[in-house]
Regions:
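Glycine-rich SAM-binding Motif I of class I
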Residues: 28, 32
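S-adenosyl-L-methionine
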Residues: 54-82
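Conserved SAM-binding motif I beta-strand of class I
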Residues: 42-47
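Class I S-adenosyl-L-methionine
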Residues: 3-5, 77-78, 95-227
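Conserved alpha-helix/loop element of class I SAM-dependent methyltransferases that forms part
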Residues: 2-17
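Short SAM/SAH-binding signature in class I
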Residues: 84-91
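Conserved Rossmann-like nucleotide-cofactor binding loop
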Residues: 51
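Conserved class I S-adenosyl-L-methionine
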Residues: 17-26
Length: 227
């Protein structure tokens, strides 16, 4: 099964020779490709439900690869730190991903794991969580798939809490010079501007209005809208 554009991007971010943990593996298409391509030397593939793991098991048997270990568990609860150096959490909401990271205390222990994260919703909340918990977002790439825009980000724990402007949580390190990056940032701009427009003229909502107005102005500058 050929990988989707989104999964291809995720696979490209995996370091060569990695020991990967793929959370919420579903059909195990990504782990199979990582082993076949030689990107990963071993993959632990987890899912919280038995049915997806059964589908994964069938696909792994068909593929002929043997370096994939399937585990039924919630997030990283059945994974030891010594077993992995790269963790993929994709296809879930930003708040769900934050919860999985938060419960795996060993992600904050040396040697640090590379996190490859692809939220389907609330990417701004995931970025906010990462920054608040001393993770550095090392890359942030926008990708369009089936008419939807996603961000795929990499992060690593540093132990250093940094200060970032509010708009960073909405656009991260996405490059506006790429086509998908431009449209991703444009979407966030329109969202912030729409909120500001809806709140304009409401005295009891002045604080929220000013927040979204400033947010849209900062994001707009990234797109050279000149606000």
């Amino acid at each position: 099964m050929p990988l989707s554009l989104r999964l291809k991007l995720i696979a490209s971010l995996v370091p060569d020779g990695a020991r990967v943990c793929d959370i919420g593996t579903d059909h195990a298409y990504l782990p199979i490709e990582l082993i076949k391509s030689g990107k990963a030397i071993r993959v632990i593939a987890t899912d919280i439900r038995e049915k997806p793991l059964e589908n994964a098991r069938k696909n792994i048997r068909k593929s002929g690869v043997t370096e994939i270990d399937l585990r039924l568990c919630d997030g990283l609860s059945a994974v030891e730190k010594s077993e992995t150096d790269s963790v993929i959490i994709a296809g879930m909401g930003g708040e769900v991903i934050s919860g999985i990271i938060s419960r795996a205390k060993w992600l904050k222990e040396k040697p640090y794991n590379l996190l490859i994260l692809q939220p389907t919703t609330s990417p701004e909340e995931l970025r906010r969580f990462l920054i608040a918990n001393c993770f550095e977002i090392t890359s942030d790439t926008a990708i369009s798939e089936n008419g939807k825009l996603y961000s795929v980000m990499t992060a690593v724990f540093t132990g250093n809490k940094i200060s970032v402007p509010e708009y960073f949580y909405y656009v991260g390190k996405v490059d506006p010079k790429t086509e998908d990056g431009f449209f991703y940032i444009q979407k966030q701009y329109r969202r912030a501007k729409s909120c500001a427009d809806a709140l304009f003229g409401l005295p009891e909502k002045k604080t929220e209005y000013l927040h979204f107005k400033e947010l849209s102005e900062h994001i707009g500058r990234l797109l050279n809208y000149g606000e």
